[in-house]
């Protein structure tokens, strides 16, 4: 295998950058548009709005080409009551978008905010409270302007924009970009902190290849900001990756990242460094899935459950995972074996899918009882089991299975006969669901 030099990587990375770097014209149009929006907000916003800030990747020249998302935060004084914050934020957001003949709607997080479309631009106008670093938040989004200020300050005299874009595109290619609960991957803010820490895309990957779960990262800037000594003991987190938030040391920026996605990042960082290719940046996860599916399939089964209206993905996906894990426990208790499981939700339906290695079993099974020398236990066991015998050191018995086919088990689930055994979350109820045989719904 030929030894690689920096040019082997740079040629590929420059090709990718040509695809993902916004043009100067695109940047200029975005700047003109954001200036117009902020100027209009200043015209109509009144006390108690402290200031108006553009945040997010477009504010820091860290966005990908054709990313026209604009995030505007309205910072309110801490004394502002929540109703005033909510009502003012919604009023200002709607009025601004209406002024530019856009389309607006209300999104819901901890409190509602206005989203909209104006021409080709996507716009969020979000109210929050003005707080200081490490000060207790009042609403969940209060840190965001502080993140923006920290990154802009830290980027001075550093040209990191392209490295951030490469990391985002690499993670998108692997299907692990996004901190929503569906993806359980890397947020944009986390990407920027990692590039800031390691100084570049290749430097980051060179370190990542040696990572293990529970890796902990503290940015050098944190020690300077808070005048901390290197031996300072930070709060412990039980997460797959820990990256301390520079504006709130009690928060792990990587908390949403699950262990499997961290391990994908480690594995494919090694793969890229050993054999660099543009392939990693463009739908690589789908190519892997398609390749793995060129094989003999197991027994496929999908539950189709109606999705309630107005329930966001960050609520639906944890609940799908919860019900599926509860069903998985029942599956194993009845000796069926699955190769994999997956969940996915579209606008109207929640899909819980399994691929079974064993979906049909004989009528009989062996029930293992206590050791033969456990007299009280043995007496109780043979009293309740007619066909008993000794196997090894235990008394055992043949029992007739309740379920010899996985489909029958699932029919009892959807008919509500196992309600007392399965944990039902609030919004994902398997009763009256449709059972689809021969179907496995992949996430998209």
UniProtKB/Swiss-Prot annotation:
Positions annotated to bind CTP: 57, 60, 147, 168, 177
An example Gene Ontology molecular-function term: CCA tRNA nucleotidyltransferase activity
Keyword tags: ATP-binding, Magnesium, Metal-binding, Nucleotide-binding, Nucleotidyltransferase, RNA repair, RNA-binding, Transferase, tRNA processing
InterPro entries: CAA_C (IPR048833), CCA-adding_arc (IPR008229), CCA_tRNA_nucleotrans_2 (IPR042090), NT_2-5OAS_ClassI-CCAase (IPR006116), NT_sf (IPR043519), NuclTrfase_I-like_C (IPR011068), Polymerase_NTP_transf_dom (IPR002934), tRNA_NucTransf2 (IPR015329)
Co-factor(s): Mg(2+)
GO biological process, one term: tRNA 3'-terminal CCA addition
Subunit annotation: Homodimer.
Further remark: A single active site specifically recognizes both ATP and CTP and is responsible for their addition.
Family under the similarity heading: Belongs to the tRNA nucleotidyltransferase/poly(A) polymerase family. Archaeal CCA-adding enzyme subfamily.
Purpose of the protein: Catalyzes the addition and repair of the essential 3'-terminal CCA sequence in tRNAs without using a nucleic acid template. Adds these three nucleotides in the order of C, C, and A to the tRNA nucleotide-73, using CTP and ATP as substrates and producing inorganic pyrophosphate. tRNA 3'-terminal CCA addition is required both for tRNA processing and repair. Also involved in tRNA surveillance by mediating tandem CCA addition to generate a CCACCA at the 3' terminus of unstable tRNAs. While stable tRNAs receive only 3'-terminal CCA, unstable tRNAs are marked with CCACCA and rapidly degraded.
Protein name stated in the entry: CCA-adding enzyme
Gene: cca
């Amino acid at each position: 295998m030929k030894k690689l030099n920096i040019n082997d990587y740079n040629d590929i990375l420059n090709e990718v950058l040509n695809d993902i770097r916004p043009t100067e014209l695109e940047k200029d149009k975005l700047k003109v548009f954001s200036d117009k929006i902020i100027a209009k907000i200043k015209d109509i916003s009144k006390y108690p709005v402290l200031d108006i800030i553009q945040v997010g990747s477009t504010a820091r020249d860290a966005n990908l080409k054709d990313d026209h998302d604009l995030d505007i935060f309205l910072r309110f004084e801490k004394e502002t009551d929540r109703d005033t914050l909510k009502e003012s934020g919604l009023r200002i957001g709607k009025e601004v978008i209406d002024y530019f003949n856009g389309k607006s709607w209300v999104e819901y997080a901890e409190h509602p905010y206005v989203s909209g479309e104006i021409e080709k631009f996507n716009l969020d106008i979000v109210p929050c409270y003005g707080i200081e670093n490490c000060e207790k938040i009042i609403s969940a989004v209060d840190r965001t302007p502080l993140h923006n200020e920290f990154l802009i300050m830290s980027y001075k005299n550093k040209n990191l924009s392209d490295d951030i874009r490469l990391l985002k595109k690499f993670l998108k290619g692997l299907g692990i970009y996004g901190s929503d609960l569906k993806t359980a991957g890397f947020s944009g803010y986390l990407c920027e902190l990692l590039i800031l820490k390691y100084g570049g895309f290749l430097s980051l990957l060179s370190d990542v290849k040696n990572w293990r779960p529970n890796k902990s990262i503290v940015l050098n800037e944190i020690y300077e900001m808070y005048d901390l000594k290197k031996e300072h003991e930070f709060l412990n987190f039980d997460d797959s990756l820990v990256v301390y938030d520079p504006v709130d040391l009690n928060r792990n920026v990587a908390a949403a990242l699950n262990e499997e996605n961290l391990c994908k990042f480690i594995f494919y960082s090694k793969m890229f460094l050993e054999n660099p290719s543009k392939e990693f940046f463009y739908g690589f996860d789908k190519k892997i899935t398609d390749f793995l599916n060129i094989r003999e399939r197991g027994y496929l089964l999908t539950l189709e459950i109606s999705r309630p209206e107005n329930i966001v993905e960050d609520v639906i996906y944890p609940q799908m995972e919860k019900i599926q894990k509860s069903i998985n426990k029942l599956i194993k208790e009845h000796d069926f074996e699955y190769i994999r499981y997956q969940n996915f939700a579209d606008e109207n339906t929640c899909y819980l899918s399994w691929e079974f290695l064993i979906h049909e079993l004989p009528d009989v099974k062996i029930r293992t009882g206590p050791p033969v020398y456990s007299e009280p236990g043995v007496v109780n066991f043979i009293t309740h089991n007619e066909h008993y015998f000794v196997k090894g050191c235990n008394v055992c018995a043949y029992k007739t299975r309740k379920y010899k086919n996985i489909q029958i088990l699932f029919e009892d689930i959807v008919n509500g006969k196992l309600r007392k055994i399965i944990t039902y979350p609030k919004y994902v109820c398997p009763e009256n669901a449709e059972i689809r045989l021969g179907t496995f719904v992949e996430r998209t």
